[in-house]
Amino acid sequence: MREKTCVKNAPCYEVERGEVMKKTWYLIIAAVFLVIGGIAYGYHEHNKPKTAQELKTVRVAYLPIPHALPVFATKELETADGPVHVELVKYGSWPELMDALNTGKVDAASVLVELGVKAREQGIDVRAAALGHTEGNIIIVNKDINSVQDLRGKSFAIPHKQSTQKVLVDCMLEQAGLSEKDVQIVEMSPPEMPSALSVGQIAGYSVAEPFGSLALEMGTGKVFEDPDHLWHDNICCALVFNGQFVDEHHDLAKAFTKAYLDAGTYLDEHPKAQEEISSKYMKFNDPVIERSLKVIGFKDLALTE
């Protein structure tokens, strides 16, 4: 029997009861992105680099948040004689990062799945290689909000309309018999959300960690809804390559993907390393990082059909 559901199985899509959303989302990614692991691309070395170091360098874009931790770990675990050299390129917003990926300024990126799908729909050649993580999202409200109904007529922030965080809000509202017409959904940069909540500009927000834990640390918000109850093993990020880079350096793209997946396994097996690497790449205090890492997973990041 098919029905529309938001609980456990899927983010408000028509699915069969009991289907696992993670697998469904894998198939969406595979169908739209052209997953590197399942496609035999031709290998053509146009614009071949001049040095051995350049030959094995992959420029990877990221935002400094826990969701990019596998990228950081890949860099930390690389060796001088390894098959891949990682050059990390930091950006301050998703639009900047996507512009760099789409135009080939970087070779790959840790990016919101929905933004990659949108790029494909616009005819831009980007290709997914792996998941970024599972979970790691949080819904925060001010202390006066005690039910979804309390959000009627109030402003609620999301990082982007094309995001898992928006899907989670849609599910939350639908479960309560509400819709976007009942709540003012606003786009806002995640770093601005905790402060906006504290001054009453917004009543709550759905976001990737650590920006929920920041509000908890400030004492201005509370956890309102466990996203896992809305969408089990929800995902929002993926490792995505620029398509031209894959065509011209296919073996290198595959080598980096393997190193990335190995890094995810390492993180899953070494929780202490998660904190150490996070502290190096993210400017948050230890309690915020520790709280953030409790709700994010890095096990089994491979995309499989």
Model region roles, listed by residue range:
Residues 3-20:
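Short, Lys/Arg-enriched N-terminal segments with co-localized hydrophobic residues
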Residues 20-33:
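N-terminal Sec-pathway targeting helices
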Residues 26, 43-179, 184-187, 203-210, ...:
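Short, glycine-/small- and polar/acidic-enriched structural segments
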Residues 68-72, 98, 113-116, 166, ...:
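Extracytoplasmic/secreted envelope proteins and their assembly/folding machinery
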Residues 111, 207, 241, 248, ...:
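A conserved hydrophobic position in a structured secondary element of the catalytic/binding core
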Residues 131-141, 221-249, 253, 257-260, ...:
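Periplasmic-binding protein-like
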Residues 215:
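Short helix- or helix-capping micro-motifs
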Residues 247-305:
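Secondary-structure end/capping motifs
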